[in-house]
Regions:
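Active-site-proximal alpha-helix that buttresses catalytic centers in soluble enzyme cores
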Residues: 1-366
């Protein structure tokens, strides 16, 4: 076959967007949770211990004890449509598809762990004949545990392909002006609905301190996100704080811890708090069960009177707008025309090699 023939080249002109998040069990049962945790906790990006040390602990202790407890937690937040994380993620993909209608972009969802998998999502894009791939991890703050692990999974799948697409993958958007604006909007709406609280807590998923000491920028990016949002709202330093949740194991993690912060505030006389979790692109076990149920109960039991959880951005119009902007920016040069009007401010931005221009634009917006 002539390699210049259309049959050999394939389509190769359309853009495929892979939306990806952490993942979820298929059911709130010990068996399903065990299967999910086995895949999740076997990732060397997640637990950076020597395999000969960690795997016996994982299979001999963790997978024997934790699934039953975790399944009960999942059952508390499981919806009629299934896992909240999967439901919100599917809605995000559907809304983004609608937002990009007519631009020759195919959006698929693939979870890092569980189903639908990154592999199945990439195979769907290959079957559709896309020649350009934009991987969009829904982790605003970069960490090797999350974003880099997505890169690993994509690379493993593509490693078995003979014909590779062009690939781009942003490494986060923790200080993206649109993201900061959307988080700020969500907080303002909560303040209008429930009143201005005594304290606002920015709660991010925790990370072992050892990972930060090895160079992971996650902690600094969490602080930067919270500071940008607080500054945009004009909050005084004594009215807000950053804390880290979901700590497990005996190791030191990024501090202060969310639960300890909330209970200490209540005991010190803080009566009302609102908690926002900007690192979670969709509500999930860590926000709905850990924060909105268990941490709420702990705060009230310690003497607090009013606790409000501010939902994740989920598939809100503001969030879909962020995702659209990210696709337009990182797909620059791939699309015949970026979504929206050609001269629309903020649509054209970061393509490969345009990081400096983006940073200058961001400084100007500040």
């Amino acid at each position: 076959m002539n390699i210049a023939s259309p049959q050999w080249r394939g389509k190769g002109a359309d853009l495929g967007v892979l939306l990806t998040n952490l993942g979820t069990p298929t059911a709130p049962t010990p068996r399903a949770v065990r299967h999910f945790l086995r895949e999740f906790l076997s990732d060397p990006r997640v637990v950076e211990l020597p395999r000969w040390v960690w795997l016996p602990v994982l299979h001999g202790i963790v997978l024997r004890l934790r699934p039953r407890y975790a399944a009960r937690a999942y059952a508390r937040i499981w919806g009629e449509e299934g896992s909240p994380l999967l439901t919100h993620s599917e809605h995000q993909a559907a809304r983004l598809t609608e937002r990009l209608a007519g631009d020759g972009v195919k959006v698929v969802l693939g979870m890092r762990y569980g189903q639908p998998s990154i592999r199945s999502a990439l195979e769907a894009l290959r079957a559709a004949g896309v020649g350009r791939l934009l991987v969009l991890p829904l982790f605003p703050q970069y960490s090797a545990v999350t974003t880099a692990s997505v890169f690993d999974a994509v690379a493993r799948t593509l490693g078995s392909w003979r014909r590779l697409p062009e690939v781009r993958m942003p490494m986060g958007y923790h200080d993206d002006p649109g993201y900061i604006t959307a988080v700020t909007h969500a907080i303002r709406m909560a303040f209008e609905a429930h009143g201005v609280p005594d304290r606002l807590l920015f709660s991010f998923h925790g990370l072992p301190r050892d990972a930060v000491e090895r160079g992971d920028p996650y902690g600094d990016q969490c602080q930067a996100t919270a500071r940008l949002v607080a500054d945009s709202m004009g909050l005084q330093p004594d009215r807000w704080q950053v804390a880290f949740q979901s700590r497990v194991g005996p190791w030191a993690w990024l501090a202060p811890y969310t639960l300890e912060t909330l209970t200490a505030w209540a005991r010190a006389g803080v009566r009302s708090v609102q908690v926002v979790c900007p690192g979670f692109a969709a509500d999930c076990l860590e926000t709905l069960e850990e924060i909105d149920i268990r941490d709420r109960e702990a705060f009230l039991a310690a003497g607090g009177e009013d606790f409000q959880y501010i939902p994740a951005l989920n598939d809100s119009p503001q969030h879909i707008e962020i995702l659209w902007q990210l696709v337009a920016r990182h797909g620059r040069g791939w699309l015949d025309a970026a979504p929206g009007s050609p001269g629309e401010p903020g649509v054209y931005g970061l393509g490969q090699g345009d990081q400096q221009d983006h940073e200058q634009d961001h400084e100007a917006e500040r």
